[in-house]
Every structure is written in structure tokens, then in C-alpha cells.
Amino acid sequence: MKGKWKILSFIMATILCVAIFAGCGTQENTSSASNEPAVSGAADTTKQIDTMVIGTTMKITSISRETYDFDVLSGTLTHMALVKQDENGDLKPFMAESFETKDNKTWTFQLRKGVTWHDGEPVTAQDVKFTAELQNTFPNYTIRVVDDQTVEFVSETENARLPIDLVTFRILPEHIFKDVTDLETFTDEKSAIGNGPYEFVKFDESAGTLEFKAYENYIDGKPNVDKIIVKLYANTDTLY
């Protein structure tokens, strides 16, 4: 399952790069991978693009964060992880401004200033701690909030892989999730609020579409594509 998550996450990250920087010329992805989205509407980098349509065979019936495919899809569009992998597979700070360790036991992450949730609230180190503890994502670590912009992951044993694990760690806003008792049934629109380049707009189950819009205050600048529509297909025969 983790391998599939990484593949789908990579696919969505590639699409996100196209959306933010707008690939040159019109192009269409005709890959036959069952969960790989097909993209139409990519365009000239010099223009602001109104809409990009993505076709996918992902199985999405709910906007719950516990819905696997929705988490992969929206998480890549709507959230920034602390760490990302570049096109060469090298680890780079993302929502974090920097990260370091001296012994592979205590990892310190300095968050970028100015990152906000889509409702305007600031993203803080407390959100990182809250999410990790809520989901029990890192059971072998104690999460320490040093200040609003600094968080530590502390373990009794060495682990050089922690930054890799954080690439797929989607942080949640504590001010929204602190009173949620069941993540699986929490499907309020606020459940999809993130801190990334796109805001979740709506899920039309009858039409089989999800809509996202560019976040005006995204810390790395508003994406070149104003709106992304994800259209769900039953199989690859109807997708292409």
C-alpha cells in the first residue's frame, strides 16, 4: 500500500508542477496506468490558464481524509509537506525552511514564516505536533514544540530516514480538527482545508468531479492554472 501511495503521490506531484508552472504547448497524457491521471489543458508558460481538467480512475466517494485516493489526490494539491523530493529524488525543505540533525535521533525543523491555512490562519509547529499525535504517525518519536516556527522529532534510536517519511506526511490545522472525534466521518468542507497551492472547492459525486482553485496567498505564489477539475472515470477504457 505504501508503494502505491508513493507512486500516486509522485504522479500528482508531477501534475501539480504542470499546474503551477504550466507546461509548454497543449499536451495529453495517454498512459494506461489504471490510477494515473490524464491531463488536458496544459498551456503556454506566459499565460494564466483558466482551467485544467484531469481524468483519473481513482475511487473517490467521500472527501474524508481517511479515504485513501482522496487523501493522495487532494493532499498533493492542497497541502505542503515539511519535506519534498525534487526531480532528482533529493530531499529538500518545503514547508520547512530547514531541517537538521546531529545524531539521527533528534531532528529539528524550522518552519517557513508566512505559510497560512486556506482560511487565513497561520501554520505553526503546534499543528505539526497535533497531526502527528492525532494520527499516531510517528509512534517512536516524541514531538516537541520549541516555538511557533520550530518543532523537534525526538527518538531514542537513530533513524536517518525520517525526512523521507515526512514527504508524505500531510499536516492538519489543529483549530479545525481538535474537536473531531472520527476522522473517517468528518466530511465537512473544512476537512479539506490545507496550506498548499490549491483550495478544495467542491465534490460533485453525481457528476463524478472534484474542483480545486488556486490559493491566492500561497507562499510560493499563485499557480498559473486558476482552476483544476478532476473527473472520475470507472476504468481506463472510458478515461482515454
Model regions: which residues?
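Surface-exposed binding/hinge segments that line
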Residues: 100, 137-180, 197, 204
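Short, well-ordered beta-strand elements
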Residues: 48-61, 106-110, 128, 151-153, ...
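Short, low-complexity disordered leader/linker segments with a strong preference
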Residues: 1-52, 90, 136, 142, ...
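Gly/Pro-rich hinge or "lid" segments in bacterial periplasmic/extracellular proteins
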Residues: 86, 90, 168-223, 227, ...
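N-terminal lobe/hinge region of extracytoplasmic solute-binding protein
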Residues: 55-102, 193
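Short helix-initiation/N-cap motifs at beta->coil->alpha
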Residues: 148, 229-240
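Short, solvent-exposed loop/turn elements at domain surfaces
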Residues: 45-48, 60-67, 90-92, 161-164, ...
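Aromatic- and charge-enriched surface segment that lines or borders ligand/interaction sites
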Residues: 97-136, 146, 152
